Structure formats: C-alpha cells, structure tokens
Swiss-Prot record:
GO cellular component: cytoplasm
Protein name, entry field: Phosphoribosylformylglycinamidine synthase subunit PurQ
Main location: cytoplasm
EC number: 6.3.5.3, 3.5.1.2
Role played: Part of the phosphoribosylformylglycinamidine synthase complex involved in the purines biosynthetic pathway. Catalyzes the ATP-dependent conversion of formylglycinamide ribonucleotide (FGAR) and glutamine to yield formylglycinamidine ribonucleotide (FGAM) and glutamate. The FGAM synthase complex is composed of three subunits. PurQ produces an ammonia molecule by converting glutamine to glutamate. PurL transfers the ammonia molecule to FGAR to form FGAM in an ATP-dependent manner.
Domain Glutamine amidotransferase type-1 residues, every copy: 2-226
Catalytic activity: N(2)-formyl-N(1)-(5-phospho-beta-D-ribosyl)glycinamide + L-glutamine + ATP + H2O = 2-formamido-N(1)-(5-O-phospho-beta-D-ribosyl)acetamidine + L-glutamate + ADP + phosphate + H(+); L-glutamine + H2O = L-glutamate + NH4(+)
Recorded metabolic or biological pathway in which this protein acts: Purine metabolism; IMP biosynthesis via de novo pathway; 5-amino-1-(5-phospho-D-ribosyl)imidazole from N(2)-formyl-N(1)-(5-phospho-D-ribosyl)glycinamide: step 1/2
Source taxonomy: Bacteria, Bacillati, Bacillota, Bacilli, Lactobacillales
UniProt-listed PROSITE patterns: GATASE_TYPE_1 (PS51273)
Keyword Nucleotide-binding attributed: yes
An example molecular function term from Gene Ontology annotations: glutaminase activity
Quaternary structure and partners: Part of the FGAM synthase complex composed of 1 PurL, 1 PurQ and 2 PurS subunits.
Swiss-Prot/TrEMBL GO biological process terms: 'de novo' IMP biosynthetic process
Designated gene of the protein: purQ
Length: 226
C-alpha cells in the first residue's frame, strides 16, 4: 500500500502525517506537491493540516483548485482511502468530497488544546481498531473548526452513521451536533478537525491517534490488494 501526503503552500502538518505513517507505522509514503497532476500508483491520500494558501478567502477555499485535486477526487470516487485533518478537512468540504462547511469558532479565537472525543462509528476504514463509543483524547488547533450544515444534511449524516467522531464533555468550537469528524456515504473519505497524527507516540504523552493510521493500513492494504 502506497500513501501520498499532499503538500500545499502553507501546509504545516505534512511532516507530522508523514512521520506518523513512515516512522511510527512503517508505511510506504511520499510527499506529493500540490502542483502535480497524477496520483498514479498511490492507494491512499492524506490532506494535512496547516494554512493552505494562507487561508485567504476561506480556509481550504483556494486549495480546492490545486492541480492535484482532480486526482484526489478520482481516488475517492474509486473507493480508495482519502483522509483530511484540520485544514485537510476544510479542503475536503470545499472540494465537495464531504458535505457541510467549517466556519470560525464561536469564540472567534484560535483554540489549541487536547480535547475528549467519542468514537461514534468504528465501522470505517480509519476507525476499525477503536471500540464504538470509546472515549479518546486528541489535540486540536484551529480557528475555523465549527462544523455547519443545514438540518437536512445533519439528519442525513446521523441517519447514515457518517458522524465518525464527536466532541465529548465540551464543544470547543460550536460545531453543530458536536461533530468533530465525518465520512462520506461510502466511508472511504474521512475529515476531522482533531489531529491524530500528533498523538501517536508515548514520548509525546498520548497514543490515542495511532489507531487511525493502523486501521487505515490494515484496511487500505486489503483494498489495494483486492
């Protein structure tokens, strides 16, 4: 299984994703520049956090037009795993790969802390090694992390079990339904505001994010070989 970590101008969590996959999990992973036009040979795509294109217009609004994005959409349409954390989640919504939008935090402040989450759906490519309703703690660091969608979309997300992670105990940004992460109908595209890649080593004090990547590698390998 070969994984691409897309690098946009202003990305700053691409190294974190790469190290979590390569160094910690031993995965076959490459950095791929946003100006590339092919993802041939890759079995999964990761969109990192950061401030792509300086967050001008809106977070993720310009990145959706990057030359690499048609290939990201192609892999998603083919059922291959596509993952976005923080700014990557924002890009996925702007690109139409996930429903809804991320708006400014209700506090109007940048929030940076570790926050409790509930694993709502453990039947996805990315969460199969968690227990349903398991409580975990992951770092967040964002100013535009408040998930918004109209009521019909929210109802559909809930009915189809597309809410994958939910904020537990407190809502740090005003996200509707306490949503921290969602997937598409097929379950192969996941976006989340928390940063699992920052919680993969005991030396950092937290390994709650490690199973996102172990789940991806376990299930993605089956998809790639199938």
């Amino acid at each position: 299984m070969k994984i691409a970590v897309i690098v946009f101008p202003g990305s700053n969590c691409d190294i974190d994703l790469y190290e979590a996959l390569k160094t910690v999990c031993g995965a076959d992973v490459d950095y791929v520049d946003h100006q590339q036009t092919s993802l041939a040979g890759y079995d999964a795509v990761m969109l990192p956090g950061g401030f792509s294109y300086g967050d001008y217009l809106r977070a993720g609004a310009i990145a959706r037009f990057a030359k690499i994005m048609p290939e990201v959409k192609r892999l998603a349409d083919e059922g291959k795993p596509v993952f976005g954390t923080c700014n990557g989640f924002q890009i996925l919504t702007e690109a139409g790969l996930l429903p809804g939008a991320l708006k400014k935090n209700d506090s109007q402040n940048f929030v940076c802390k570790t926050t409790p989450l509930e694993v709502v759906n453990n039947q996805t490519i990315f969460t199969s090694q968690y227990q349903e309703h398991e409580r975990i703690n992951l770092p967040i660091a964002h100013a535009d992390g408040s998930y918004f969608a109209d009521q019909a979309t929210l109802d559909e997300l809930e009915a189809n079990h597309q809410v994958v992670f939910r904020y537990a105990e407190e809502n740090p940004n005003g996200s509707l339904n306490n949503i921290a992460g969602i997937c598409n109908r097929a379950g192969n595209v996941l976006g989340m505001m928390p940063h699992p890649e920052r919680a993969v080593e005991a030396i950092l004090g937290n390994t709650d994010g490690l199973r996102v990547f172990k789940s991806l590698l376990e299930n993605g390998t089956v998809i790639a070989e199938g």
